[in-house]
């Protein structure tokens, strides 16, 4: 119990430190996957309300037991057959990488009589394990136009992960490419849509660079909660 209590104080101090580094207009998604409810409650007590999870079952369990005003973002790769389990309550699905997934989110949101905000995930990083749409695939999806018929999803922006490397210039160039793609999509398809405004990039190791390169939403876990408990 002593260790849990001590770590809860650490979480609160870490959260305050991160928030002090974020300029006005940049929002924090506290990535709480694999962390115990006590840590989320500690961050909640400090005023944090937006948390990110990447596993449907873990998210369901946390949603059932934690305060209902928490805004849950789903940040992981989401299988279409799992959408129905989170559709009733999820605030945003950040990692949409196919028209098929968009259709399923729309279908399940309609069943729950709500509109679900989503971000389209870009694949810019060099790692092969990263999911997401290549720049050309993103352009193709948008040009196809079927997304316009989906009444229960709202595309609010783009999300991406930079390469996990020490080369700051490479990281910066990937964020800049993401920003230019955001501007391109905004101009062509969402010029009159103020809700298309989110640029979700930047994690514990690169969020300060991400903010410099136009991020509006950073996803930070380890810096706040410490190493994950698997």
Where do the protein language model's features map onto the residues?
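Conserved alpha/beta-domain cores
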Residues: 2, 6-205, 213, 225
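Gly/Pro- and small hydrophobic-enriched strand-loop and loop-to-helix capping segments
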Residues: 215-230
């Amino acid at each position: 119990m002593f260790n849990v209590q001590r770590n809860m104080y650490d979480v609160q101090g870490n959260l305050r430190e991160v928030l002090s580094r974020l300029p006005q207009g940049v929002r924090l998604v506290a990535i709480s996957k694999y962390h115990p409810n006590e840590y989320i409650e500690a961050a909640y007590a400090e005023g944090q309300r937006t948390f990110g999870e990447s596993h449907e079952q873990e998210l369901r369990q946390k949603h059932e037991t934690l305060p209902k005003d928490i805004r849950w973002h789903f940040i992981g790769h989401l299988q279409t057959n799992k959408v129905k389990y989170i559709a009733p309550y999820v605030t945003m699905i950040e990692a949409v990488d196919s028209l098929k997934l968009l259709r399923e989110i729309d279908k399940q949101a309609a069943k729950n009589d709500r509109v679900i905000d989503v971000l389209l995930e870009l694949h810019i990083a060099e790692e092969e394990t990263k999911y997401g749409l290549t720049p050309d695939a993103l352009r193709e999806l948008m040009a196809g136009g079927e997304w316009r018929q989906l009444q229960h999803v709202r595309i609010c922006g783009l999300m991406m992960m930079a390469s996990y490397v020490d080369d700051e210039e490479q990281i910066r160039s990937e964020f800049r490419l993401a920003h230019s793609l955001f501007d391109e999509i905004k101009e062509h398809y969402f010029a009159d849509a103020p809700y298309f405004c989110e640029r979700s990039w930047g994690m514990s190791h690169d969020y300060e660079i991400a903010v410099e390169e136009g991020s509006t939403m950073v996803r930070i876990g380890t810096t706040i909660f410490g190493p994950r408990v698997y």
